[in-house]
Structures are given as C-alpha cells and as structure tokens.
From Swiss-Prot:
Top-rank lineage group of the source organism: Bacteria
GO molecular-function term, one example from the UniProt record: ATP binding
GO terms under biological process: protein unfolding; proteolysis involved in protein catabolic process
Chief subcellular location: cytoplasm
Family according to the record: Belongs to the ClpX chaperone family. HslU subfamily.
Keywords: ATP-binding, Chaperone, Cytoplasm, Nucleotide-binding, Stress response
Name of the featured protein: ATP-dependent protease ATPase subunit HslU
Length: 441
C-alpha cells in the first residue's frame, strides 16, 4: 500500500493533470486515510469507515484521468467501472456484485505477482538446474539418485549459461500443457456460476506436461515462471488477496450521472434507479460471494464521478447521496488551461508529436505563439459547439499535424516550425465555420 503523504500524491498528480486542485486534494486525503486507518488498533480500526467521494464536473476535465493515475499510485486493488454497464438483479446485464468479484480478481493477480517476485531467486536456481539436466542428462543408472550433479562439465556449462553463451542453443524440455479454454454462455445474473463451471472443466483437463523444442533463452524464462508458480502457496495467496481487497480496495464508479432517474416515468427503471438500489448495500457494507471466498465491502473506498449535464446530484436516490458524503466540483477548462495541458504534463501532447515525427528524422518545433493559437482554437470550438474539455485538443492537434504526418517519410532531415501563422493557415477555416467545426473538429 502507498505511504505517500497527501502533498506528495497531489504533486504526483500535478505532473499529469492540470488544475482541479480540490479534486486532487480530496483523493489524496482519502488515500492517506487508508494508511492512517491501518496504524490504529485492530478493534478501533473496524469502527473507522471510508468517506466515499462524489466528483462532479463536465466531460474532459480530468475525472477519469485522476482515477487512472490514482490506480498507479495506490499500490492497492483498484478497479474502474462504468455505472451504465450494470442492471438491476434479475434483468439482462451485469449485476453490481460483479464489481467486487473483478476487484478480487485484480487483487489475486497483484498478490500472485508479488509472491512470485519474492521467490524469484529460488525459481531461477531450479530453472537453471532443469536446463542443465536437459543439456547433460544423467546416465540411466543415476536416474534414481537424488544427489545434485556437481561434475566439472556441469560447472562449465553452468558458467556458459550464466554468461549467455548458450542463449541461442535449442533444447527439448517438458513444459506444463496450457489449460484448455472453455467458453460458456452465461444466463443473466449467473456470471459467478459460469466462472465456477469454467474452473471445474479446466481442472478436469489434462494436467500433464508437453515436450517442446525452443532456444535456451526462451526456455529459461518459461521455467522460471513455472518454478515460481510451484513455490506460491495458493491458499495463503487467496487469504492475502481477500484481506487486501477488504482493507485497501478502491472502486471508481464512472458515469454515475447516467443512472439518475430523469423526470417522471412509470414502470421499473432497471438500468437506473434499480442499479442505484443495488449499489446501496455494496457502498454501505455487505458480504459478496466470489470464487476465491467471501469478501466484506465495509471498508472498500468508493469514488463516484459524473458530468451531471442532463441531471444533478440530487437526482440520485437520497440513500445513495448519503453514502457519498464528500462532494468535489471540477471546473471547466479555460484557454490558459489548454495552453498548460499542451506543455506542462509529463509526455504532453506536443512532446508526443515531436517524438513521433522524430522517428522519421523530422524535427518539429512548437513556438510560444503557436501553442497559444492551438489552445485558443480548441477553446473556441468547445464554446461554439459541444464542450468536450481537453479531449478537443486531441482532435485539433491531429487535424493540425495531418499534412506533416502524411508527408513525413518524404521530408526526412527537415525542420518544421509550428507557429501562430502555421496554426492559422491550417485551422482558421474550420474554427470560424460553425458547421465544419461540428463535423470535423
């Protein structure tokens, strides 16, 4: 789990996301509170529940990007889901409990990788011995002898193997046969039963090994994975993963505004209000049955986000509103924000285009006034048509760089300067013509 302070988390988010300081502070405090809670006494720790967050802001201002970056910083089980993918229990579509099952699967993967790293040294030793056995098979009379072979020849081959002199030599080895993939069409709401059936059929399949011929370099990597997998205790791994989910799990619910009930309508609303009702026990705290064991959701942190352009947060059912106590509003982006987005973040849009053209030996230089013109053009199109936030910059940049990208292979060694005049000549007609802006930008 991450031990970064809120200030460090905000600083890390600042390298990728421009503005939205309030939202960054809220998620940073929430992430730090996960660590603070774990420092408390076990009895008192159970009483401290996470304060879930609702992020409100127009599209393209950084809500989803904050979630993506937070996932990398958290070093904890994290899953991002679209609220629109789920329906009420009993109807066609995914049940909300699938969120916790997917979160548990990601924790299992994380724990397995962590345990395999810990036993990597032993796995490398075992893989080395298997390769040497394939290169120097024991005499028939020594097959039952368990003593390690420390002959001079074996040591010479061991030295060559470690120095990489045998990498290209082909050997024939026994590797675990791949599991047979069995696809089962699941009835609505029965995904968990389907998963269990798939696991059962796969375990019934042939568990023996298969003889394959491959270069030593490739065989060594494969054997390390096999040996590491043998050293991992599956029961301990599952226990650790479930503990990790229950104490540190984070769920990011995107597009929650799309499941608000709009206006007065009669009849069941299975993909909106029904989903909200099903989310209540998850957010409040319940026990979900997964194929790895029972998972309690009492201390899982939920971060919900939505644009709320066609609805408002008060359109959520009151019970769900009460379970999202921290509200953060993200502001719409200005032309100055666009200018900063083009230059300040790590691997910014301008840096990406310079690097891409550099592969063709074409040098691109963006001037200060050129960047200002691009930012202004994107902002104007957003104001006149639909405001899609920073995503508009991608459209504008692709349109601006289209000619250069097409001719780059024929202009190797040349330098091109993207200044205000260049931007004006390529974008002015589209920006000024509202009809063209709607269809092209």
């Amino acid at each position: 789990m991450s031990e970064m302070t809120p200030r460090e988390i905000v600083h890390e988010l600042d390298t990728h996301i421009i503005g939205q300081h309030d939202a960054k502070r809220s998620v940073a405090i929430a992430l730090r509170n996960r660590w603070r809670r774990m420092q408390l006494d076990v009895d008192f720790r159970q009483e401290v529940t996470p304060k879930n967050i609702l992020m409100i802001g127009p599209t393209g201002v950084g809500k989803t990007e904050i979630a993506r970056r937070l996932a990398k910083l958290a070093k904890a089980p994290f899953i991002k889901v679209e609220a629109t993918k789920f329906t009420e229990v009993g109807y066609v579509g995914k049940e909300v409990e699938q969120i916790i099952r997917d979160l548990t699967d990601s924790a299992i993967k994380m724990t397995r990788e962590d345990q395999m790293k810990k036993c990597k040294f032993k796995a490398e030793e075992a893989a080395e011995e298997r390769i040497l056995d394939a290169l120097l098979p024991k005499p028939k009379e020594d097959w039952d002898n368990e003593k390690p072979d420390d002959s001079a020849t074996r040591q010479i081959f061991r030295k060559k193997l470690r120095e990489g002199q045998l990498d290209d030599k082909e050997i024939e080895i026994d590797v675990a046969a791949p599991q047979v993939g069995i696809e089962i069409m699941s009835p609505p709401g029965m995904e968990e039963m389907t998963n269990q059936l798939q696991s059962m059929f796969q375990n019934m399949g042939p568990g023996d090994s298969k003889r394959r011929k491959m270069p030593i370099k490739e065989a060594y990597k494969l054997m390390i994975e096999e040996e590491a997998a043998k050293l991992v205790n599956q029961d301990d791994m599952k226990e650790q993963a479930i503990e990790l989910v229950e104490q540190h799990g984070i769920v990011f619910l995107d597009e929650i505004d799309k499941i608000c009930k709009r206006g007065e309508s009669s009849g069941p609303d299975v993909s909106r209000e029904g989903v909200q009702r099903d989310l209540l026990p998850l957010v409040e705290g319940c026990t979900v049955n997964t194929k790895h064991g029972m998972v309690k959701t009492d201390h899982i942190l939920f971060i919900a986000s939505g644009a709320f352009q066609m609805s408002k947060p008060s359109d959520l059912i009151p019970e769900l509103q009460g379970r999202l106590p921290i509200r953060v509003e993200l502001s719409a982006l200005t032309a100055d924000d666009f200018k900063r987005i083009l230059t300040e973040p790590h691997a910014s849009l301008t840096e990406q285009h310079v690097a891409m053209m550099g592969t063709e030996d074409v040098k691109i230089e963006f001037t200060e006034d050129g960047i200002e013109s691009i930012a202004q053009a994107a902002w104007q199109v957003n104001e006149r048509t639909e405001n899609i936030g920073a995503r508009r910059l991608h459209t504008v940049m692709e349109r601006l760089m289209e000619d250069l990208s097409y001719d780059a292979s024929d202009k190797s060694g040349n330098t091109f300067v993207i200044d205000a005049e260049y931007v004006s000549s390529h974008l002015d007609d589209l920006v000024q013509d509202e009809d063209l802006s709607r269809f092209i930008l």
